[in-house]
């Protein structure tokens, strides 16, 4: 019997795959557990529509990420911090502070986990901070740390 897997089944198939399995296995296990449905023409058409919808969403997310990349690369985030002699900061600037400053200054909401700051910023001046917007799209955000008076 041909079935469409709704979830990954170890040793049998992955989600969205169409496979031939034994009738008893399909009826007594896969269907009852909600792991698969029968591969009827209507179900195949629904699966195809679902795949197309997912592809459209993925393409839209990629386009949005590229658009956001262009915006971010034009911006500079200004952060004022207390500093000592030689431009060393008291404390440091973290990805959370960068995300909050970006929201406050430019109205762009960005998750702090997307800001890939290896080490916190501990000096005054300009720093280029990598931002991972999408698995395929990365941007560079300029952060300008100034001395707080």
Curated annotation (Swiss-Prot):
Disulfide feature: none
Q: Report if keyword Metal-binding is assigned.
A: no
- Show the GO MF annotations: rRNA binding; structural constituent of ribosome
Q: Establish whether keyword Ribonucleoprotein is in the entry.
A: yes
Q: Which InterPro entries match?
A: Ribosomal_bL9 (IPR000244), Ribosomal_bL9/RNase_H1_N (IPR009027), Ribosomal_bL9_bac/chp (IPR020594), Ribosomal_bL9_C (IPR020069), Ribosomal_bL9_C_sf (IPR036791), Ribosomal_bL9_N (IPR020070), Ribosomal_bL9_N_sf (IPR036935)
Record's GO cellular component, any one?
ribonucleoprotein complex
Checking SUPFAM superfamilies in the record gives: L9 N-domain-like, Ribosomal protein L9 C-domain
Q: What does this protein do?
A: Binds to the 23S rRNA.
Stored HAMAP family: Ribosomal_bL9
The entry's protein name is Large ribosomal subunit protein bL9
Q: What is the scientific name of the source organism?
A: Geobacillus thermodenitrificans (strain NG80-2)
